[in-house]
Design a protein with these regions (language model features):
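Helix-to-loop junction immediately C-terminal to a conserved catalytic motif
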Residues: 48
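Catalytic Walker B motif of ABC-type/P-loop ATPase nucleotide-binding domains
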Residues: 157-160
Length: 208
């Protein structure tokens, strides 16, 4: 699904990747690990079309990633769980989850029902959809971000330190959810230092 061939990436005089080649296949969970500053987040941002890269060295579904329009990629192909959650902090949970349902023709009742169901899936049934994001703990906000991606249901999910704000038990619950998505032929790539994710991933890739 994603083929990285001889990728080179530099920031000024600092080379992050030199001749990096990797293959990612749908229906699998990949864990990216390595020391801080090794390029995990940079690689995710490149795959998300946020960070530019040199040469035409990445293909997605057989097409050069650079040739895919960014708007289409963000709207239809990608779910990105940012390290800082990527949520609208001053908006309600419902407003944030609405972003995962863009493009779906749903009544207000259907939308609310789906959002309440996904909160149950991520262990947040006790929260109200009217609560503001800034009122939540870090772990709760992280799970709301995951709920938004689940609603969007994209073929590619990227996650940066997905479980950083979660305890080990909740980390396993979140991974169980991702493994369910994996069975639906989703490709999931997670940058993480968490051994819980290493254990459950199909492949662990260590960047130097």
């Amino acid at each position: 699904m994603i083929s990285v061939e001889h990728l080179t990436k530099s920031f000024g005089q600092r080379t992050v990747f030199q001749d990096l080649s990797l293959q990612f296949t749908e229906g699998k969970v990949y864990a990216l690990t390595g020391n801080s500053g090794c390029g995990k987040t940079t690689l995710l941002n490149i795959l998300a079309k946020i960070e530019p890269y040199e040469e035409e060295s990445i293909s997605y579904q057989g097409q050069e990633l650079k040739q895919i329009k960014q708007h289409h990629f963000f709207k239809h192909e990608l779910g990105y769980l940012f390290q800082n959650f990527g949520l609208l902090e001053n908006e309600t949970i419902a407003k944030n989850l609405d972003l995962g349902l863009i493009g779906q023709k749903l009544t207000k009742k259907e939308k609310k029902q789906q959002e309440e169901e996904v909160l149950k899936k991520v262990g947040l049934a006790y929260l109200s959809l009217d609560q503001k994001i800034y009122e939540l703990s870090g772990g709760e906000a992280q799970r709301v971000a995951l709920a938004k991606v689940i609603l969007k249901d994209p073929p590619l999910i990227l996650a940066d330190e997905l479980t950083a704000a979660l305890d080990p038990e909740t980390s396993r619950e979140v991974m169980d959810l991702l493994l369910t998505l994996k069975k639906q032929d989703r490709l999931i790539i997670i940058a993480t230092h968490n051994p819980v994710i290493w254990e459950q991933a199909d492949e662990v890739i260590r960047l130097n």
